[in-house]
Amino acid sequence: MQTRGTQAGLHIPECSLSYAKTIIKLNDMSTLLRQHAEQQFAEELHELKKNEAYPVPENWEMSPQSVVTYLMGGTLKDGFVVTPKYIGNRRLMEIAVATLVTDRALLLYGLPGTAKSWVSEHIAAAISGNSTLIVQGTAGTGEEAIRYGWNYARLLAEGPTEGALVQTPVMKAMQEGKIGRIEELTRIGSDVQDTLITILSEKTLPIPELNREVQAVKGFNIIATANNRDKGVNDLSSALKRRFNTVILPLPDTIEEEVDIVRRRVESFEKVMELPAEKPALDEIRRVVTIFRELRQGATADGKTKLKSPSGTLSTAEAISVVNNGLAMAGYFGDGQIHASDLVSGILGAVVKDPVQDKVVWQEYMETVLKNRNGWKDIYRASREMM
């Protein structure tokens, strides 16, 4: 391990100096609305590297085993506790991380709100120490967002030169041996998507204007995300699909899993936003999650009553937003304690996307389920008032 001398003649490990600098930077970033994963969880990443016991692939920050521990949580040899970032099937995370050791890229696929972007960010943070090499896919994303672009003022003045070249996050990831991220891949036009084929198969990016190419350094790979239930998406070509290993992220299997996810994310949000409201009772979170799961699955939890499902996905991410909104309502326009009336407005906003069909779905749910369920009369009354 490299050391650096101090005036007192002490030798401090380079990793400790790096970690200390990171902590100083984090103190300066306390006013940020949202920190990157590598900033927010810098201590955990540092401890995992310090306790590393497995071989580390070239240009990775830690071993694949440690990356999975970072994602799933666990207790290290020295007793340090790593918090879980993903609550679900561990095998899915092992498959995702193992894919990135190979020459195939990773496609995280699933319904909106199933933590695809969240997992992508944390995998990149753990492997590369940098989750910011990202391309946000939209219908207007062009080839220059994936391959490279030009500073047109310099291009006109100098012609195609290195100084006029504008590097993309993908190009930087190739040169630095890091993980590049592409969000909402299927929102990008099919012709633009296919510019990835050469990058993923040949690991090169030709720049014919400069008569050269960029060759990927070991450690480079791509994580892409895509929704399987969305309007305005472009299917991947069969050639591009072959370059990806697809991992489907499902909705939480059990209500306990989903409640735990919502609770953890709400507590994190409350800490960052410093809301003047008390931590929501677990029962309130459970009620929101129960409503979402029942409407999503088209039946009550006991399976006795069939229900209509609304047009929206009612994902875990939306449940988190509903509780966060309820906290804000309680803190600024209530008594600081979260009540049914604070939650109902958010629930209605998530459920009633179509003002005609979804409204009917919610009204039927109110009258057949909420009205007759013990201890839920407050939500029923608040819903009636809002409707």
Regions found by a protein language model. Name each.
Residues 26-274:
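AAA+ P-loop NTPase catalytic core and its hallmark functional loops
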Residues 90, 94, 168, 194, ...:
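Non-catalytic, well-ordered alpha-helical scaffold segments
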Residues 266-337:
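Conserved AAA+ ATPase small/helical "lid" subdomain
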Residues 331-387:
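C-terminal engagement/docking regions of AAA+ P-loop ATPases
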